[in-house]
Amino acid sequence: MPAIESSFLHAKVNLLLKLADSPAQLVQELTQFYESYADLTFQAGLFTVKAGDLPAYHNPALMNRELETAFIKTSAQEPQKALEIIDLLAGRHQLEPRQLACAMLGHLPAEYFPQVAERLAAWARAVEEPEDLVWMFKRGTALMRQQAPEQWLELLQTWLESDNPANHRVAVYGLTSMINDASLTSLPLIYKHLKPLMLECSTKTLPQLETILERLIEKSENETVFFIKQLLGQSKNPILTRLVRRSLPLFSTAAQESLRSHLRTL
């Protein structure tokens, strides 16, 4: 892999952005740029790349950062042009252009959030590796999670309630990525959307809810214990009780005893 000089990199990225009116040409030139600085000596196992199973160019980190910083500005300033570029990048097989597409998608303005959700849903259903879903949702919902978290949570709730098992898997990883990224102050919003699903949980949704509950415990055990006690006080659903009992080993000893004591009062 040839070394890349920062002034050349900056100039090259600016030249690429001048092709924004010709998305196909831009992506063609960008692909050649990726290929020119690919690490052909990379061997799996020498160092870790959180990339699922997608083939990767293994370009210099500086190059990927510079491209992402520049291209997300196009998303903010010229969103319609950015969408065309995003769709072409997402059609590539390699990791780097797909991650760039997700980063651009995640910085489209609020009026484009419906298009953001539509693309993420389509892309996610075609992904096999959980690791790829994690970075896809983290990058692709960056602005939506900041400006309209409820809109994103409503979509995840719809997927979780769907009759399509593929949507359940997508919803779990979407919600997991949001929980992992959430501040403690935003957890109540997540609990709000989970509440009806937990109260009406069934054998169909039980595995997905177990995974989500595990992530919530890791994020904030105390908040999650309080949330579960509220649920148990509002529902006689035996599946919910089973879910809580099966999840007890995930809690600390003190939290387990607190929940067992609460269960005995029901």
Regions found by a protein language model. Name each.
Residues L189, H193, K204-I212, E223, ...:
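Short amphipathic alpha-helical segments
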